[in-house]
Amino acid sequence: MPLRKMKIPFLLLFFLWEAESHAASRPNIILVMADDLGIGDPGCYGNKTIRTPNIDRLASGGVKLTQHLAASPLCTPSRAAFMTGRYPVRSGMASWSRTGVFLFTASSGGLPTDEITFAKLLKDQGYSTALIGKWHLGMSCHSKTDFCHHPLHHGFNYFYGISLTNLRDCKPGEGSVFTTGFKRLVFLPLQIVGVTLLTLAALNCLGLLHVPLGVFFSLLFLAALILTLFLGFLHYFRPLNCFMMRNYEIIQQPMSYDNLTQRLTVEAAQFIQRNTETPFLLVLSYLHVHTALFSSKDFAGKSQHGVYGDAVEEMDWSVGQILNLLDELRLANDTLIYFTSDQGAHVEEVSSKGEIHGGSNGIYKGGKANNWEGGIRVPGILRWPRVIQAGQKIDEPTSNMDIFPTVAKLAGAPLPEDRIIDGRDLMPLLEGKSQRSDHEFLFHYCNAYLNAVRWHPQNSTSIWKAFFFTPNFNPVGSNGCFATHVCFCFGSYVTHHDPPLLFDISKDPRERNPLTPASEPRFYEILKVMQEAADRHTQTLPEVPDQFSWNNFLWKPWLQLCCPSTGLSCQCDREKQDKRLSR
């Protein structure tokens, strides 16, 4: 046989082998995100009283990141950064106003259609993709059926969960997250109307001023209208905003908390079982442990930390079910699993009965909605038995934005070249090929405001953190903004610092002792480098539409989703009650 003809079969065999080898090297990817879980809650991060054996098992079988940072201390912007590998301010997913998360399903704001998620990249590489649980990145733009922000328009083949978030208002008897705001928007106008009525009545009775009867009726009508709108909003909020979806269809409105974690677990397990022969991406986004807190009968009252501990332990059980399933299907060695939280624990969450409904941020100051370490330092666990050595601990600064380039590279997907990607590939750190994080600088945003800069200089163990402003805790001396339920980012809610507050996080992780020129000889030199880095960073920020503008944020009736039902109740339950997984 001529040599040229002999080469052809060998070349074909080589290319076939290369293709099969590439497919075999691409792992399944499971990204697990808790909601408002503090770094001090899991046992593997030091908690001795909440039982998290399955999260701990994940950590002992892989790598535990001790300085893993959320790109934002709030749900919506943090999740946008996680999905895109970019600071949320780059996509308009960071608010310039008081409210930094979406509160209505019928808002037009959301993750822009031109943003590229890791789900899009992996779907293009042949991965089957699913999001189970919480989305909170918007739904529709112009009509209720355009679904421009829906998970299925951002790279996911399958969606089962909630489009908004879990809120107190979603569970009867748990109060409302709007109470504080309504004190200004509702109660203050009512007080003004009431005082005006009494004053006019007194003047009229004393004969000092003649007030037509129509004025009294008008003021009474205005007060009744304000009160009616307030009560109507609270009454209809739950069915209009708290519902379960499967892909584009509402299947339960309002959603039921009965065995909700079990239902999410069943959906995740079924997705894995459907994709044992093809690579898959599963984002399992728990509703735990955001309020309203809940748990099934098997976990209620079983922990040492009330309903919060019950919820954490139920979530841990669910993680264990996924790990056990991977073992049963012999997929564990070929699956990269990542576990994290979208931000730190919400320390201001206290029930009307005085029970603590927020978690623990361990030794760290602050919590959700601020950039003290307690608000942004979150659990970060990765396991891939075939590649990552078990039992490691990495203290280098990493970000939840790093997941985007990491999974893209593992899937063989090229990174977009038409935009800045702020995340960095974690694999050199995880495989021990590098001892240093690729992040020399990280920037911490309070909504859309640049709040702080973190600098890890080369050839140094120091990790400097400079605050341009800090939240005003209330009461003074507490560890949170209890008067407003979360900390805000501007005006009288913050204190600006000139020069910035400077800490060495490597020596003072509790952020108790700000440095001074007397205690740090290079004080001004360090701040100069950090300010220059911040200036360079802000110059890379494009002008983009604000997804939290009043126009995008407010409720729009023509965008309201409602399942077909009799009357105007927006109530239905098409959810098939799957048999609960045994504990």
Curated annotation (Swiss-Prot):
Substrates-to-products reaction catalysed: dehydroepiandrosterone 3-sulfate + H2O = 3beta-hydroxyandrost-5-en-17-one + sulfate + H(+); estrone 3-sulfate + H2O = estrone + sulfate + H(+)
CC cofactor: Ca(2+)
SUPFAM superfamilies, sorted: Alkaline phosphatase-like
Consequence the record notes for mutating residue 372 to S: In IXL; loss of steryl-sulfatase activity
Cofactor binding note of this UniProt entry: Binds 1 Ca(2+) ion per subunit.
Main location (coarse class): membrane
Residues that, per the record, bind Ca(2+): 35-36, 75, 342-343
Top-level taxon in the UniProt lineage: Eukaryota
Residue ranges, Lumenal side: 22-184, 235-583
Signal peptide per UniProt: 1-21
Molecular function GO labels: arylsulfatase activity; metal ion binding; steryl-sulfatase activity; sulfuric ester hydrolase activity
Site feature location: Not glycosylated: 333, 459
Subunit structure: Homodimer.
Job of this protein: Catalyzes the conversion of sulfated steroid precursors, such as dehydroepiandrosterone sulfate (DHEA-S) and estrone sulfate to the free steroid.
Protein name: Steryl-sulfatase
Provenance organism: Homo sapiens
Lineage: Eukaryota, Metazoa, Chordata, Craniata, Vertebrata
